[in-house]
């Protein structure tokens, strides 16, 4: 029950941040439509974009789940759908073929 509450809080925080980012993008777009001849965005729009980007980045890092270590032995014993790549002879011999081509060029 607690994990669903925590996930709901994370989702609500992220949705709030996405709506703030959307508002910032909209206000920047409206400002660009009414832009003066010098072609520069107003300072408040620039500050708003920087602030929202930093807020989104830090909040995402804070509410993210902890990183898990990669366990090679867990994954190495499972069958991979990409196993056919290891059976391609040209793929395995690319270094050898490259050396032959360079010898022919010289």
UniProtKB/Swiss-Prot annotation:
UniProt topological domain (Cytoplasmic) ranges: 1-12, 68-106
Transmembrane stretches, start-end: 13-33, 47-67
The entry's keywords: Endoplasmic reticulum, Membrane, Transmembrane, Transmembrane helix
Tree of life domain: Eukaryota
InterPro entries: MMgT
Gene Ontology BP term (one): protein insertion into ER membrane
Topology within the bilayer: Multi-pass membrane protein
Keyword Kinase on entry: no
Gene Ontology CC annotations of this record: EMC complex
Keyword Transmembrane: yes
Any Pfam family matching the protein: MMgT
Subcellular location: Endoplasmic reticulum membrane
Membrane side Lumenal: residue ranges: 34-46
Family, as annotated: Belongs to the membrane magnesium transporter (TC 1.A.67) family.
Function: The EMC seems to be required for efficient folding of proteins in the endoplasmic reticulum (ER).
Assembly, per entry: Component of the ER membrane protein complex (EMC).
Protein name stated in the entry: ER membrane protein complex subunit 5
């Amino acid at each position: 029950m607690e994990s669903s509450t925590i996930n709901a809080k994370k989702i609500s925080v992220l949705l709030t941040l996405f709506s703030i980012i959307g508002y910032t993008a909209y206000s920047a777009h409206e400002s660009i439509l009414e832009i003066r001849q010098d072609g520069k965005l107003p300072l408040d729009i620039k500050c708003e974009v920087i602030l929202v980007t930093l807020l989104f980045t830090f909040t995402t890092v804070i509410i993210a789940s902890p990183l898990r270590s990669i366990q090679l032995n867990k994954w190495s014993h499972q069958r991979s759908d990409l196993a056919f790549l290891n059976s391609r002879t040209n793929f395995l011999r690319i270094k050898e073929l490259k050396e032959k081509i360079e010898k022919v060029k010289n």
